[in-house]
Amino acid sequence: MTPQELALWKYQRYIKNYLRVIKSVDDSVGEILDYLEAHDLMDNTVIVYTSDQGFYMGEHGLFDKRFMYEESYRTPLLIRYPGNSGGGRAEALVQNLDFAPTYLDIAGVEKPENMSGESLVPILKHNGKAPLRWRKYLYYHFYDHTTEHNALRHDGISDKRYKLIHFYDETGNIPAYDEFYDLKADPSEMRNVIDERKYSRLVKKFNKKLQKMRDQLGVQEY
C-alpha cells in the first residue's frame, strides 16, 4: 500500500467501527426505554443520556479528544424528567460536575458543602431557563501531555459565544501561545482572532477572568 492508500484504509476502518459503536449504543438505549415502558416505570424514572466528552472525526486535523475545540469540548446531555412536558432546550452552561448535585436534589438529599457543581433541577422545572445567578463561564484544563497522543497541555474559559485557550509547556520546549474564537462568527473555530484589534478588549477581559478562575480553583500549573 502507498501511504495515501494506507491512510484511506485506516480512515474507512475507523469510520466503520465508529458507526458500529453508535448503532450499538442506540440499540442499547432503546432496550432500556422499552423495558421501562413495559414495566410502567417511565413516570418514576429520571433518564439522563450523556458522555464524558465529544470526539474528533478529522476536524482541526485531529481524532480522539482532549483539545478544547467544540467537537470534543461539548458533550451530549438529554434529560427526561417525570412531570416535565419535554421537548425543551436549555442554553445554560452546564458541566458533568452538576450531575451529582442534580441526583441528590431529585432524591431530596442536601448537597454537601464541599461538593462542586450545581443542581440542574431548577432548569428542568422551568423549561430550560436557568436561575439568574447561574454561571457565565466554564473552565477547562488538560494537563496530561504524553507521547501517546501528543495533545499539548492547555487550559481556558468560554462563555456562550467566546472562547480563550492557553497552550503551555512547563518544560520550556514549546513557547506558550493563546487562541481566541468568536463562536457566533466562526462556529468551526478555524480563525484565531487573538491578535485582531476588534477583539482586544474581549481578550483582555477573558484573560483576567481566566486568571481569576485559576485562583478560585487553586490551579498551580498553567
Residue ranges and their predicted role:
Residues H39, Y69, E91, K111-E113, ...:
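Short, surface-exposed helix-loop/turn micro-motifs enriched in polar/charged residues
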Residues Q53-E59, S85, L97-A100, D105-E179, ...:
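C-terminal cap/loop subdomain of S1 sulfatases and analogous C-terminal strand-loop tails that border
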Residues D34-G88, Q95, E148:
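Histidine-centered active-site microenvironments of extracellular/periplasmic hydrolases
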Residues D27-G30, D34, P101, D105, ...:
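Solvent-exposed, polar/charged alpha-helical surfaces in well-ordered, non-transmembrane soluble domains
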Residues Y18-V25, V29, V46-S51, L77-I79, ...:
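Beta-strand elements within well-structured catalytic alpha/beta cores of enzymes
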